[in-house]
């Protein structure tokens, strides 16, 4: 079974300075999903676990297409992320976020920063919510999307109380 784990990697303040993840929790900006860090995910000491995710049926199908190098490959690999305020538990049949938040120009997905493979059997997707994005929302759901906007994985969690004061950098690990 494919598993996923979302973590808060760091918090950047609006002035460009980095704040500790612990301080962001103390301010009520981030609510951790778990205080306990699972093993085998390649987590760094300062990372805060937001919670696990559910890999969708469409995500599993995209993985099969990518394995076979179906063209264009960008349609079948993780390229974007989305945010929302939905609270319904994820299901493998989900095809979208329950209640998406729009980014710039009304788009509901945004390009990820990077994907790295520094831990065996784990792909880590990193993405940033800019200081100017999703302000005034309690972000309770996230999704990873392919290049053609197919929902790969979805996570519903306690929340990120987003303001223009900070820009969270998140890591979403998928273990194979």
Predicted regions: what is each one?
Residues 1-139, 147-176:
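Small cysteine-rich, disulfide-bonded extracellular modules of the LU/uPAR three-finger superfamily
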